[in-house]
Amino acid sequence: MGKVPSVGLTVSGIPVNAAVKAGDLVGISGGKMVPALAAVAGQVKALGIAAASYAVGDTGAIHVVAEVDGFAGLVAGDAQYLSETAAGTVQAAAPVGVGKLSQVAGFAVAADRVVFAFQDAGVVL
């Protein structure tokens, strides 16, 4: 994926602290862009989608709302959650296990397309 088209707000001028690919779910840690992950409560929650691929030291942009295709086998209307195992990606089910982040990142609108509009993250109790 080269660049991800935005359908809403884009925030630019963000320093990058870890390599990210276009379309990765990202958050901010220490004022810098990093991949988001739901493995434990202390991980970085997702704030948006990387607008392009960036290397450490780059300055990047985040799409806060975006429609992204290239998925397969999704069910329209189903929530897509921040992944607990693969940084920067989504999973179809809410994370299970005490202390993990549970964050809806967006919703499938077709078998191959997700509209991302990030919700606040909670911690699984």
Which stretches of residues belong to each language-model region?
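Glycine-anchored, exposed beta-strand/edge motif detector
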Residues: M1-L125
